[in-house]
């Protein structure tokens, strides 16, 4: 529990990285724009059917889809090299998908757990030594709400160990339970492994960041917008409340000498005070030395 993570010089000396979550498919214009914006890090999501239950159950079809996504990323990495952009490979849609409760099937079914590890072995063999790849992000926003034979922590550990046997050099990214929530860092233990980066997502408070997402504004009779800073439920949300909500991550960082990566954070465009919320988040990330990628860049195109 008191494990101190160490990093090779290449990672330890790397300055704070700032960037964005990727579109579903890159164009040349996307890369040129990211370069103009001085983006240094992109979290490249391998995803489909977000929000749907019981997807990605046909593993042969899943592998064909995955091969196409990896082919695309390999071409993107080649084109992006001249811009000096680094990428985190993010397995956003793992084999087996999620059930109706949003738990991941692979935590409960050996077939999908085994395939998850095989997927990462394939990715590691393909991208080992690729200068554009900053890290392997094993699974996006794990959710495990009940006891599981292949729990969110141990399955990531097993995949990390499998990757390390193939690629000992590329950093591995681990995520916490509860949608990679900062709150779940209270019970997250570090892997007994070096060169591991720990990721958090920041969408707190959700009633602000996601207000009226999914057309609930019209469905709920045009209730009032939630403003930041301001009272939300029983709490007053401002920069210090954001800091308080992230405290478990900060404690984890200091206790374990961990490099922290904020893989996603955002607020919906129409949220009153969204720019203030983002500014306050980024100022805290920068104060703590956390890498960050904003969600998202041209995701809806």
What are these regions (language model features)?
Residues 19, 118-121, 125-128, 132-133, ...:
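Extracellular glycoside hydrolase catalytic/binding regions
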Residues 301:
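Active site of divalent-metal-dependent phosphoester/diester hydrolases
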Residues 292-297:
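His/Asp/Glu-enriched short active-site or ligand-binding loop at hydrolase and phosphoryl-transfer sites
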Residues 2-171, 176-185, 193-195:
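Active-site mouth of glycoside hydrolases
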């Amino acid at each position: 529990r008191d494990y101190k993570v160490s990093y090779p010089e290449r990672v330890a000396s790397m300055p704070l990285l700032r960037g964005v979550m990727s579109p579903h498919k890159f164009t040349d214009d996307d890369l040129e724009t990211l370069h103009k914006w001085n983006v240094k890090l992109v979290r490249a999501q391998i995803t489909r059917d977000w929000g749907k239950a019981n997807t990605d159950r046909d593993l042969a079809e899943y592998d064909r889809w995955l091969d196409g996504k990896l082919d695309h990323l390999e071409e993107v990495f080649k084109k992006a090299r001249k811009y000096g952009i680094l990428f985190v490979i993010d397995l956003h849609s793992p084999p087996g998908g999620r059930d109706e409760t949003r738990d991941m099937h692979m935590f409960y079914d050996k077939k999908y757990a085994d395939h998850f590890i095989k997927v990462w072995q394939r990715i590691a063999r393909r991208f080992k030594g690729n200068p554009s790849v900053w890290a392997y992000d094993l699974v996006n926003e794990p959710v495990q709400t009940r006891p599981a034979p292949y729990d969110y922590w141990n399955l990531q550990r097993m995949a990390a160990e499998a990757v390390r046997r193939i690629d000992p050099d590329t950093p591995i990214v681990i995520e916490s339970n509860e949608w990679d929530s900062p709150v779940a860092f209270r019970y997250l233990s570090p892997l007994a492994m070096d060169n591991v980066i720990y990721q958090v997502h920041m969408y707190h408070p959700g009633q602000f960041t996601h207000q009226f997402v999914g057309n609930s504004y019209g469905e709920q009779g045009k209730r009032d917008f939630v403003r930041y800073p301001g009272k939300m439920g029983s709490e007053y949300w401002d920069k210090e409340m954001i800091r308080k909500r992230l405290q478990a991550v900060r404690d984890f960082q200091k206790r374990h000498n961990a490099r922290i990566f904020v893989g996603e954070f955002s607020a919906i465009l129409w949220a009153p005070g969204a720019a203030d919320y983002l500014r306050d988040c980024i100022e805290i990330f920068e104060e703590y030395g956390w890498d960050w990628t904003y969600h998202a860049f041209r995701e809806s195109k």
